[in-house]
Amino acid sequence: MRTLLEKLNYKGQQRIAVINAEKNFRLAPVREIKKIQIDKEIDPRYPYDFMIVFAKDSSEVDEFTPSALHNLKVDGILWFCYPKKSSEKASPGLDRDHGWKALNDLDFFGIRLVNVDENWSALRFRNIKFIKSASDRFKPGKEL
């Protein structure tokens, strides 16, 4: 069975950011992450290749988007985790297709969905200029 890190396209980056995660969140078994520096806050001086941001609602998406994009390397891997509809933490304005205006307005669109656990899903965002199969759904004014 693939680990969450494998599902999230982790490629051996030495330093990553995992922002706003719940205290009980486990990214991977300890043996798998012991050589990775995991920042729980974005270091404004560090450009990240791999970043995971947890958002309980669209206001948290709005809050974390500017610093996440500012510190994401060109075509870095950016995941936003959000509560599943079946979770008690679910927000009516945040799901796979809604609540991502802050990212969409900056030309970042959801390209891949991954199951994190029973309460969370993760949506990978990528800048439109790196999306090979850009279709009409990525045109300006279309919120995902």
What are these regions (language model features)?
Residues 4, 129-144:
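Flexible, glycine-/basic-rich loop-and-beta segments that form/coincide
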Residues 8-21:
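Conserved class I S-adenosyl-L-methionine
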Residues 23-29, 88-90:
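Short, charged/polar "capping" segments at the starts of alpha-helices
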Residues 37-48:
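Short acidic low-complexity segments
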Residues 51-61:
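Short, glycine-rich nucleotide/cofactor-binding loops
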Residues 62-96:
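Mid-chain, well-packed structural core segment of small domains
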Residues 93-112:
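Conserved Class I S-adenosyl-L-methionine
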Residues 122-130:
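Conserved beta strand-loop-helix elements of the APE1-like EEP
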